[in-house]
Amino acid sequence: AIEAAFGSYGVEVIEQGLSTRVANLFSGRDSEKVCRTRAVTEFVQPINPGLLASHQEILDGNSIGATLRAAGFTINKKLLIKTEIRATAAFIALARGTVGEGQSLFTKVYALYAETPDDSLPYAVIAEAYHPDHYPPAHEEVTEIADLKAAAQRALKTLQRFRLKEGLKTPAA
């Protein structure tokens, strides 16, 4: 969706641990990168054995959706939360000042499943805050699974609290 709307797309992993990652999904190149989506991913633990090879590629910094699709999976996103959060200094820096402080950012939290014709494998809960110029594709299927809803709340809190380390404008800086 970012590439179709803005002509380019990239993923910059800002922070990553064994169970979470914070990423900048951007358009542009080099010093012209503009954050279109800031994503906090909480990986479902333990990782399903059928997803381990793809998971390693994702931990190496590759796009979650593109990696899973290349491995033959289809993606199913089940909406957990739809809300707005305010732009923080971190989002403003990643968006190269194209968003104002406190500006509303449309935000979704969803459970991502990697699916085959025979199986549906829970992979992650993802919270995404969107640049005002980038409206995300719709995926409105809702889940009531308690563990996923709890993970959604944790990911949303991390998305709201996330700050760039002192002096860091963008991970490429």
Language-model regions: role of each:
Residues A1-V109, Y113-A173:
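N-terminal domain-onset segments
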